[in-house]
Amino acid sequence: MLDFAVNVRAGSPPGWLTERLTARLAELGRYPSASDERRAVEAVASRHGRDAAQVALLAGGAEGFALLAGLRPKLAALVAPSFTEPEAVFAAAGIPVHHAVLPPPFALAGLARTRGADTPGIPDEADLVVVGNPTNPTGVLHPREHVLALRRPGRLVVVDEAFADAVPGEPESLAGESLPDVLVLRSLTKTWSLAGLRVGYALGAPEVLHRLTARRPHWPLGTLQLEAIAAANAPDAVAEAAAGAARLAVLRTEMTAALRALGLHVVDGAAPFVLFAVPDAELMRKHLETKGIAVRRCDTFVGLPGNYLRAAVRQQWPVLVDAVTEVLQ
């Protein structure tokens, strides 16, 4: 199966990272050490120019969403279409959710400030707002000033930057900003092909991070996770990720142009995936499956019409485009 549905960059981590993890296997009989945790925290802090107290290590960016319910917001506003995990977390905790649905082209500039519960804007009473940048599944990269415009007194803005390191230069990232009311969640899973290990981190004010992690058990991350976080945030690794992001951007441009040449609408974005509309998404997806190609269905995302599909940016994109062409003909 040629998998365009999952946004992990490669089938396995790079050799040097695998070697570092393998070298720690003999230590798995011991609990993770404080020095390993400190080394990982310091690597993240150094990368983003933050104080160590502003870093919380996570078992994947998704754990950050799972912990948000512990902040007990009165009303959580989710900028949609977006990653579905936050809604599931808040719903399970009985926390009211408001979907602030962005109309095409899915830019924050199209989000009006409103108070009505059934309107597309963000109610003033929302004391927690979640926004992706770049957003999954649209791939749209919002200007940082538009994200910061979501701030209000008494409100925490949570920015999902799971795909930020796939954007060349990370120009709109808030990871390096020390703001008391902005919490940034980052993932290392996609770029470093570590979906089976679960690694990420949160960046925010120490008080916010304390509340976020207050109910976690001891040793929430294992030795291999801590090693991976330290390794992936070292200067050489950051440079390698940046080079990979530049290559992905070229592939994305080529892939987008090819899909548009078929007469398809492709959303302008900067993520390592593309969102495009087809006349019949279910028919298209089933045809692609017969060709051994998987893409992501999008009818599960709030605010997104069912005729959209999402496909990861891969070197094999011509195979996908050829298969799509067969259906359109």
Positions of predicted regions on the chain:
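Conserved PLP-anchoring active-site segment centered on the Schiff-base-forming lysine
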Residues: A69-A91, P96-P103
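Conserved beta-loop-alpha segment that forms the PLP phosphate-binding cup at the N-terminus of a helix
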Residues: E37-A40, A52-A76, T84, G200
